[in-house]
Structure formats: C-alpha cells, structure tokens
Amino acid sequence: MGQKINPTGLRVGIIKDWESKWYAGKDYADLLHEDIKIREYLENRLSTAAVSSIEIERAANRVNITIHTGKPGMVIGKGGSEVEALRKSLNNLTGKRVHINIVEIKKVDLDATLVADSIARQLENRISFRRAQKQAIQRAMRGGAKGIKTQVSGRLGGADIARAEHYSEGTVPLHTLRADIDYGTAEADTTYGKLGVKVWIYRGEVLPTKTDK
C-alpha cells in the first residue's frame, strides 16, 4: 500500500495538512474549478520562481493564497510590484478579493518538488540522468535528510525502449504514517519525448503532540 500510493495523500489528516482549506455546499464544483484555475495560473506565471506548493483558504468573498517558494524575491518583485500585479490578475480571474502570503523555503534541497524540478531542468539541458540524480541525493543528505529516493522514467539517453531507473540513499519508510516524507514530481521535455521525475525525501519522524483535555 505505502509503496504505491501518493505519500502525501496517505498522510493527509495525520501529519500532513490539506492544500485547499474551505467548505462549500452546492457551489463546491465551481470553487474546485476556481482552485484549479488559480493553481495553473500561478504555476505558469511563476514557473522560474521555484514554487513548491500553493495553499488556498476561503472566507466569505475573500481568497487567501499562500505561496511556498525557494525564491521569494522573484515572486515579490522590486518594492512588491510583482506580487501586487499578481494580486490584481487573480482579482480579475476570480472576481473576489485576493490576499497573497509569501513563505520562503529555507532548505530547498529538502523539498521534494523543488528537487524533482531541478533534476527535470538538468535533463532538459542534456545532463546525464545518473549524474543529475546522484548530485541531488548528495545535496539532500548533506542538507540533513534521513533518506531520499529518486526515479527517472522514459526514453533515458534516447533509448528506443522506455525504462525507469532509480537511486536511493538512507531510509525511506513509506509504510510508517508518522514518517515525514515529502513527495514531488516533475516532467522534462527532451528531444526524445517526456521524462518523468519522482522524488521521495524522508525528513524524520513527526511525533503527535499531546492536547490538553
């Protein structure tokens, strides 16, 4: 089970939180489509800003968006010009008041989405898939990861038959629900077709906190 399922989905409600936080009645489908539009717009516009995740919260006619990024300066812009332009665009897109929070990711080598994206960009620049994966693993382990696993699949090196190759170091306990495992994917567009990149990073155990009764 833990080997196949998305590690984040398996842990939501246990040690992971939802990325969309709102309740809805009959307009649920409309709000869900609006969420998808917001995410697609931000991912396209901020494609070079190392965006890891986007959280969306709703209250009445207001949308609060939290962007987790490794390059906050690119998102904010000079004097906040870029984030203000972003807010106006999202206001027009949704027809609602939008508030944007920027959260900086301190350790980019321990963020699976950013690591996967980095490997994908290297593959597009014709760097060997083995070298790209091994360098990512070394950086993550130096950065304090307990374990990491990477996989690249597709026509590796322009081979006629597609295959998958993975490398790992340390431990990645996918069945342990209290294990803080970050999972990220990315795609690389090469001259031979698309290559898929998957990354699992084990950052240690998250112990449940005692609540006052």
Curated annotation (Swiss-Prot):
Which InterPro entries does the protein's record reference?
KH_dom (IPR004087), KH_dom-like_a/b (IPR015946), KH_dom_type_2 (IPR004044), KH_sf_prok-type (IPR009019), Ribosomal_S3_C_sf (IPR036419), Ribosomal_uS3_bac-typ (IPR005704), Ribosomal_uS3_C (IPR001351), Ribosomal_uS3_CS (IPR018280)
Pfam annotation, one family: Ribosomal_S3_C
User: What UniProt keywords apply to this chain's record, in alphabetical order?
Assistant: Ribonucleoprotein, Ribosomal protein, RNA-binding, rRNA-binding
Q: Which GO terms describe its biological process?
A: translation
This entry carries the following GO cellular component terms, namely: cytosolic small ribosomal subunit
Q: What does this protein do?
A: Binds the lower part of the 30S subunit head. Binds mRNA in the 70S ribosome, positioning it for translation.
Q: Which family does it belong to?
A: Belongs to the universal ribosomal protein uS3 family.
UniProt-recorded name of the protein: Small ribosomal subunit protein uS3
